[in-house]
Amino acid sequence: MADMKSIQADARERMGKAIEALESNLSVLRTGRANPGILKKVIVDYYGSTMPIDQVASITTPDARTLVITPWDRGALGPIEKAIRDSDLGLNPNNKGDTIFISLPMLTEERRKDLVKNAKNYAEDARIAVRNIRKHALDEVKKVEGVGDDEIKRGEAEVQKITDEFIARVDSTFHKKEQEILG
């Protein structure tokens, strides 16, 4: 049987992973500035195998609205361009022979609202994950043997305190991204 400290440490670690997943999901959402992270989920079909774009090319941002993709092998230019076009990012790659340029258009108000809505959904998914972890931890606390009711109540209160801390981090992460999107 686990003790209170290990239950709390496990809950904290798992809630931390929920925050990492949220940050990863939010990094893909486009803001008004060029960010190589928006291409993170673009998968390139290259010589019969699929791999993330950052494994076949370097991605740089020379200015606030341009991404430059330089493949390590010129043979990857076509597949990279196709993968970007086929993604649901709404980007238009421009092949210059040895590099691909992507000029990011200004976000329309409607697109910004859609992005905020997506960010809100990711944040809600993270909140649900944190609450599920809390429920699991509280169940584990109640199963601990050889401790009194007071100790169980303290353990439950500590799990709730950890949960509140991580929910606040979810909210903070969401609001930061919302401000980025709305500019």
Curated annotation (Swiss-Prot):
Belongs to the RRF family. It is found in: Cytoplasm. Responsible for the release of ribosomes from messenger RNA at the termination of protein biosynthesis. May increase the efficiency of translation by recycling ribosomes from one round of translation to another. HAMAP family: RRF. Its main location: cytoplasm. GO terms for biological process: translational termination. SUPFAM superfamilies: Ribosome recycling factor, RRF. It holds the Pfam family RRF. The keyword Secreted does not apply. This is Ribosome-recycling factor. Keywords: Cytoplasm, Protein biosynthesis. One of its GO terms (molecular function) is ribosomal large subunit binding.
